[in-house]
Amino acid sequence: MLRDGNEGMFTIPGFSQIQFEGFCRFINQGLMEEFNKFPKIEDTDQEIEFKLFVETYQLAEPLIKERDAVYESLTYSSELYVLAGLIWKTNRDMKEQTVFIGNIPLMNSLGTFIVNGIYRIVINQILQSPGIYYRSELDHNGISVYTSTIISDWGGRSELEIDRKARIWARVSRKQKISILVLLSAMGLNLREILDNVCYPEIFLSFLNDKEKKKIGSKENAILEFYQQFACVGGDPVFSESLCKELQKKFFQQRCELGRIGRRNINQRLNLDIPHNNTFLLPRDVLAAADHLIGMKFGMGTLDDMNHLKNKRIRSVADLLQDQFGLALVRLENAVRGTISGAIRHKLIPTPQNLVTSTSLTTTYESFFGLHPLSQVLDRTNPLTQIVHGRKLSYLGPGGVTGRTASFRIRDIHPSHYGRICPIDTSEGINVGLIGSLAIHVRIGHWGSIETPFYEISERSKEKEARMIYLSPSRDEYYMIAAGNSLALNRGIQEEQVVPARYRQEFLTIAWEQVHLRSIFPFQYFSIGASLIPFIEHNDANRALMSSNMQRQAVPLSRSEKCIVGTGLERQAALDSGVSVIAEHEGKVISTDTHQIVFSGNGNTLNIPLVMYQRSNKNTCMHQKPQVQRGKYVKKGQILADGAATVGGELALGKNVLVAYMPWEGYNFEDAVLISERLVYSDIYTSFHIRKYEIQTHMTSQGPERITNEIPHLEAHLLRNLDRNGIVMLGSWVETGDILVGKLTPQIANESSYAPEDRLLRAILGIQVSTAKETSLKLPIGGRGRVIDVRWIQKKGGSSYNPEIIRVYILQKREIKVGDKVAGRHGNKGIISKILPRQDMPYLQDGTPVDMVFNPLGVPSRMNVGQIFECSLGLAGDLLNRHYRIAPFDERYEQEASRKLVFSELYEASKQTKNPWVFEPEYPGKSKIFDGRTGDPFEQAVLIGKSYILKLIHQVDDKIHGRSSGHYALVTQQPLRGRAKQGGQRVGEMEVWALEGFGVAHILQEMLTYKSDHIRARQEVLGTTIIGGTIVNPEDAPESFRLLVRELRSLALELNHFLVSEKNFQINRKEA
């Protein structure tokens, strides 16, 4: 697709556009395609016919708003109606009714779905494109074996291979292979037709012996031979019509369905002209594939690169939703058939509405969004995370690879990724290279290809007819694309004579006159995360990868601040995330408060509600703050309210703080960070977190559970925050152990469940004491905070399957503390090791104390020098009150451009502020600073500046854990693992060696017995500790040893052990 003029040349497409386009394609095309496959349904006697008039389908307006769907834990969906007809063939009577097919979840303005009140997103999957691929592999003798692989639309594979004697075999499974002549005969060709339609008939005749002639003597023989190999059946099967139909269905229709994309690819690869609507493998395809394979054997033709993007396709949200819709219609068809036959059997008169149930479609989509690996809960840590999540690209999932089986070649960067898939942004760990991110300019083409725009350079471009062209990966090899050229579109600027360029997957240096296309934007090759890193060209790629991942983990702060040094993409990232409120047209602000903005324009008055302390699924606080004043006039597109982590419509994930790169008493050893107490007391890095606690009331066999504030046997101060209904009051401050919701569960009354005083009351006074069990919702450890919302969701019907749900939301204010993780935008991460009083921090020559001290040894070995440029330029920007937005790769315009920019700005800041220490020519960028404890200057000059530092979601409050008592595993009798289960720390093999090395025998014995799995000994410890007695050494073996003995017994091995007495060394036999 070509676009005339410079329109859109520097306009970045919406970051959620790919999701929107995919869903629109599903609604406009996918639904109709699947409806057209729905067959006419007849009963067994062919008296009644049921059909859908699919041209008249309707999608109704959603019954609830997005916000209500989230609040009430419902699905934001639309009801699908279609006209259905029931025809009685005997009298040609027809009954038409509009039937309700089911609910289809709708995409909202964020490009996500709301299912059961939870934001979910569908990830794009990248798969091998259906078609035919030629490869060469070495066999065990080191001889090249040429194979052609035919991949079907659903991922099934069939292979043709040619051996040393030029015989061609068809391999339908890994073990079984048959002659290609048998396959072609089974597909309906005779020998004469085969030989007439191939280029090398003599090769086919060369491996035709008497045995082969007998196999392909008739179509029946060929089908029997093929069925025997394909179905792996023994004996001699007999030819029958049912066998022929089974083979036709299982192999030729299922295994060999190419789909529209597969048919197009095979036509292009084999130079065929078969119509696109013929989506199954034909004998003509197999003959052409065999001819190409023979050509490969003798050195003609080119092999295919399986990892080239032209051989991949994107399975977008449209394809996944369409597949599920087709599956639901198949289920609906089976249900209608069953209902029709049941109605006729019981002599009932069916109607279309009685035949169609909505459960097929609704349950299919519910299970898809709930269980499918490509449907994920939207990560809403911050606005950047939301938009990046929708642009992920996964090789995993159904039909793809797995993290354990994927080869290095699949994970690696390929030249065809240039401008399409970001070479930097991928996950770390086992899925590295398998989960990528789309570059910012790409779009998904009609055939599932990834297209990227380039600016065309032609003779006509001199006549002001510049064009932008979207290039698919299959067309790359026809063009020379300039890679490192400057982006000036002004014709007057003379381009370099020689430029680096890309041609046929190689990077060359060519003359400017030979270039066909040039890149349109410096960020064109990167994803959003990588495009937000300033001076990325000065960083090692591994650190840039860490940075793009860590920006997604940044916590929105209570007082956001935009970065001094940025890349210019911050505004669009904030805009497309949907967290800000933007004026849709110009008008006047009538009133504004924290809850809503009343805005008049175009003759209408709009009430715009603002998000107030909304919890994200990562427990961060999503909040909108009005940015306009009453009575002000606003223009279209102006920011009315900022969201979490945005300032003035720009992304603001962190804070600009004064940093120094120097060692300080070992407190910044191994990436630790030393910070000033100013960051705590001035709420610089304070963030709000909202935790959700919920409880359900069920209908038990003894009666319903009750919500009440009258709970026996509990101290009054634990119930102090409950209202008369037994639910915590809004605005209450709650501590660990407090009751949030009081609940009593009825249980069977038996004598053993009564306390002694209850039995006395019942015997003397005849008072019936309640036997309900207390099952209240208590605040767990680390949950203290302020109650900001309570929701009581009462489902209709109130049955045991639809329990009432009570949710309590508690707001926590968290200052930065020792153990929290902070990071810059260059992969420079660290843990807070010490918080110093501000008077002890190093201070500058004007007396300003430093906020953070980083280790200078973290820079040279990691090669992320971009942080040094950002740090120094940030200092200049702070002193000059300027903000910089710098595109990457500025060295393309001038050598050392970044360094010159930074030094010139520092020099100007030094002149304007009359502070010569800001830029000292002897050590530019560095300055002499003073020790806050002694007032003496440090020996060497230190690099100081303003860096943009983020606080990450990995906080010590969520990680720190100690176990006093807790649960034990049933088999090993050892403490469980993990903070959530109140687990313990494992003393493993290597820890035991370490303790042995120090000779601490008693500590080691305690860890392996009392504190772990010696059941009797650990019970005795408590009693002896309370009375102050001595803890006796256990004389029998711990449970883990007894478990080993029992496991050996199961293998018929008896193991006895003996304990040697310390007194007389007599051996006492002890049974295990």
Swiss-Prot record:
InterPro entries: DNA-dir_RNA_pol_bsu_ext_1_sf (IPR042107), DNA-dir_RNA_pol_su2 (IPR015712), DNA-dir_RNAP_su2_dom (IPR007120), DNA-dir_RNAP_su2_hyb_sf (IPR037033), RNA_pol_bsu_bac (IPR010243), RNA_pol_bsu_CS (IPR007121), RNA_pol_bsu_protrusion (IPR007644), RNA_pol_Rpb2_2 (IPR007642). It comes from the Eukaryota. GO terms for biological process: DNA-templated transcription. It catalyses: RNA(n) + a ribonucleoside 5'-triphosphate = RNA(n+1) + diphosphate. PROSITE patterns: RNA_POL_BETA. SUPFAM superfamilies: beta and beta-prime subunits of DNA dependent RNA-polymerase. Keywords: Chloroplast, DNA-directed RNA polymerase, Nucleotidyltransferase, Plastid, Transcription, Transferase. HAMAP family: RNApol_bact_RpoB (MF_01321). DNA-dependent RNA polymerase catalyzes the transcription of DNA into RNA using the four ribonucleoside triphosphates as substrates. This is DNA-directed RNA polymerase subunit beta. It comes from Lemna minor.
